[in-house]
């Protein structure tokens, strides 16, 4: 019934198995990839023809993690998987980026890649396995795809590169880098690092590319026996149309791209576009030689050519800059004085308002992943409203791009944050992009660094980021520092580098062509370092290190530790005690399972009141000490006094006064304030208190009378 094919290799010390022919046979391509005991299913379906009027390539990559893969049931009311998690969105983008450039230009058939994590061994991260499975499924599908693609994770542990480290090994690694590419080219890099040098980062990229070559060989072997017949696809030949358009529009386009101001340049380009459209699509002609979609596509291609030629020929950019100059920078802090920390970062026509907010443990984000529930105390949210580019558009929940840009900035800042022990706050940073003309994610990195320092968060060092581009034609190439939005899509490699003066904390690369050598990447990274250091210098004019104290409106947090066996007493039955402390003191209280207590409030008095209250609950009273207490109950045999936090003790009727007492209520009543001395504990651990040995007026202990009956000594 099944015609199955399988290839198995040893990869980084673990077996990798690729299978096809048994599962999802109605898809164009389907591969079940097993690495260790992590199992991922990837499927590909591509429409047989494009939709009428389709003018772009509608590729969708959906990565999904099923909770059954880790033997879990989803949380929440409905008990089934819902909208994609942040991690699922990020992995979908991670897979999309290296495969998208490998579809031929002009292919516009609706294509969907669905990758499902079926089983997770809690050792091997499924994202790289998913990338390999998707590449294999595409290669087998018959869809025009110039793959296969390989992918690998690289760690850096004790000065050595490690291929596909286990999940627990990543805790020791100073690098988390994922690289993807073909046999002869790197296509994508995504990474977080702890201030590593450009040389180490580049070495990791090269190490990773060599590391995934066996995977590409395995996919090719599987394709040789299991691939479907390639679909016939001939891209349209628009060379004649392009040459004709070039003769009409080249001069005007070159003039337009010498205009340095964005709005004026766009207006000039639109005028050229209208002229071209009028020439090739004259009014009144029923059957023109070319469609509007063809005209628009070729014009866009022509724009890119002219900009690239101009940069390579003149070493001059669209806005008049040379290749290495960074746009003018203005950095400000304290923009919103009632927030905990704020900054305005402007670089040319790209601008971000970034606001930092400090919270307590109860503000931490709970993340339910396949590896288990964990808490995240640093959140960075990036917002890109349509007004930032002078357009109207959808407003609502963040899209994939916003989530991806926010995570890129998160990776850049995260290595420089203090530990929870050093700074016990939850941090949320929001970046509002108010203007955009290229590199808004790197503006977010710079603005976040400024806002956190303004908030008094003790960053190890300031962090800055820069977006770079590269254009290559034959043996000529040009590396562009701080690219514009118009330059973003024209290059053969665009990459973003963030870090401190000492090293890189985040690197993201997307390479669209083969032939980008290690030497070219080294030149590009060195140029990026110079740009990053320049930006750090401009940022230092606003603030160069974290403020010594928190902002006026930020909460203060005091940390204290209590014995684990006392946690129950502080919380109380059904949370009664801790609710009372919070209500009466006004402070926020968070208690961890290890006995760490975080008390937060904008008022020092509220923190101190809560701290004393908790201390009174968990501390043990000392025998021989005098305490002030309150009578909470009277009985024939004595009075019960609350004298130490929530602790009560009995004052026996014989200990109420020095003279004989006939009735307890003759001496005390409920609610009376009294002074008591802790005499000790009985054999059952019950507290023994005495009032008669304490002067009830002063609270001082009365010295024992002399044996001869004389007056008490002073």
Curated annotation (Swiss-Prot):
Keywords: Cytoplasm, Magnesium, Metal-binding, Nucleotidyltransferase, RNA-binding, Transferase. Its main location: cytoplasm. Mg(2+) binds at residues 488, 494. Residues 624-692 form the S1 motif domain. It is an enzyme of class 2 (transferase). Involved in mRNA degradation. Catalyzes the phosphorolysis of single-stranded polyribonucleotides processively in the 3'- to 5'-direction. This is Polyribonucleotide nucleotidyltransferase.
